[in-house]
Amino acid sequence: MAELSDQEMLRYNRQIILRGFDFEGQEALKDARVLVVGLGGLGCAATQYLAGAGVGQLTLLDFDTVSVSNLQRQTLHSDATVGQPKVESARDALARINPHITITPVNARLDDDAMTSLIAGHSLVLDCTDNVSVRNQLNAGCYTAKVPLISGAAIRMEGQVTVFTYRENEPCYRCLSRLFGENALTCVEAGVMAPLIGVIGSLQAMEAIKLLAHYGQPASGKIVMYDAMTCQFREMKLMRNPGCEVCGQ
């Protein structure tokens, strides 16, 4: 396991002193390789905290460019980066947050084989997209590679987070997505409140840190839902579907 430098020990001191986290937890983060797919609102929120917390290697995957309409909620981007690839804008912002980590941008749309190959080289994947077909592609690749997937979604004033670890008898994302099909609304169509994006992206980062450092209980086997209108959280148990095309028998 990678050792922490003196500068890193100072930087991450508030995490290291947490009961049960210690140097081992911080070194596990430094060793980790996390793939973040989608550098919109959720991806911007999640990666800020993953970078700040000391995740050693972040791979940023997106094929979109920054537009003015993104700036309300996509906090790594700015007026100065409008027109740039999102992964490059995000990389530069994250490098300013933490110069001790490695950030690799991938400005591309990948086919299934390339996606699965990329996933297999990582410790964990964050799904920060707003596209059901891409979400299903990520789920299939993560299931094949047995790499945990943390899925987040936010629209209007509601958001949700789910962790998929692909252990025996646990559900996968397709068990969920087959319930509502391919025609889920997006933020472009329905709108979204900016701070809600920050809440859900931060929850994704927290779940990632817990998984990587074996710290706490991950939100697997359930959907954690947040209603920003009433400031209430609730959970719904997610069952594995025997007829699922990905994880079913």
Swiss-Prot record:
An annotated Gene Ontology molecular function: metal ion binding
UniProt entry keywords in alphabetical sequence: ATP-binding, Metal-binding, Molybdenum cofactor biosynthesis, Nucleotide-binding, Nucleotidyltransferase, Transferase, Zinc
Top-level taxonomic group: Bacteria
GO cellular component, one term: cytosol
InterPro entries cross-referenced by the UniProt entry: Mopterin_Synthase_Sase_MoeB (IPR012730), ThiF/MoeB/HesA (IPR045886), ThiF_NAD_FAD-bd (IPR000594), Ubiquitin-activating_enz (IPR035985)
Enzyme Commission identifier(s): 2.7.7.80
Cofactor note: Binds 1 zinc ion per subunit.
Residues involved in Zn(2+) binding: 172, 175, 244, 247
BP GO terms, sorted: Mo-molybdopterin cofactor biosynthetic process
Keyword ATP-binding attributed: yes
This protein's record includes keyword Transferase: yes
Biological or metabolic pathway of the protein: Cofactor biosynthesis; molybdopterin biosynthesis
One Pfam family in the UniProt entry: ThiF
Complex formation: Homodimer. Forms a stable heterotetrameric complex of 2 MoeB and 2 MoaD during adenylation of MoaD.
Role of this protein: Catalyzes the adenylation by ATP of the carboxyl group of the C-terminal glycine of sulfur carrier protein MoaD.
Family recorded in the similarity comment: Belongs to the HesA/MoeB/ThiF family.
Entry protein name: Molybdopterin-synthase adenylyltransferase
Organism, scientific name: Salmonella typhimurium (strain LT2 / SGSC1412 / ATCC 700720)
Lineage of the species this protein comes from: Bacteria, Pseudomonadati, Pseudomonadota, Gammaproteobacteria, Enterobacterales
